[in-house]
Amino acid sequence: MLFRFGSDRWLGVHLGMTGKLSAEPPDHWPGKHDHLILYTRTLALVFQDPRLFGRIRFDCSRQAPKWWSSLPTPVLSREFSIPRLSEILKKRGRTPLKPLLLLQEFFPGIGNWMADEILWQAHLHPRTRAGTLVQPAIAGLHAKIQKISKEAIRIIGRDWSDPPRSWLFLHRWEDGGKCPRCRELLRRQSVGGRTTCWCPACQKAALPRRRSRS
């Protein structure tokens, strides 16, 4: 987020994983995890971040800071279209979907559990290579990226509430957890160096193509 003050003052805020901005009364007293408070006559804008993953930047210039214009396309913007997603998948064709979704230069804001949730809801195996997706699967992946991102902001970003139990989220942490869709035992392994959870029944791995004999 970028805030402008006057003609040449800019404040950039990156929430990170646990950061939160809130509007509080003007007499707000700093809490343990309050790292920036902007006081006005009517309210206090408070930046809280328990795990210190967020960032604050201050710039002085007539134009918006250069780093702002170089940020990747937000996944909830109009520019993040199905053709745009198709380009990314083609460009990183050999990369498995799970580690690809975690690349912030393509999918800013998507973290580990969100990537698992997106793939589970899209019925895609986390090791599926990006370049193997056909158009209906790409459209489905695009829809789930935007749906999960919107719901994460609405549900979790508001007051840290848990998503509904119909999601993978609450079951992916449990030993012996079962898929909320088909009740199959969930599987957890490292994919691309990150702990990954999926349902082997709902997210079947694509069979390797047979080489034609010459």
Which residues fall in each region the model found?
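A cross-family signal for N-terminal binding/gating loops and helix N-caps
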Residues: 1-56, 175-181, 187, 194-214
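Basic, nucleic-acid-binding surfaces and adjacent catalytic neighborhoods in DNA/RNA-processing proteins
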Residues: 86-214
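Short low-complexity stretches enriched in small and charged residues
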Residues: 2, 71-74, 154-157
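Phosphate/anion-contacting hairpin/loop surfaces
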Residues: 11-109, 114-121
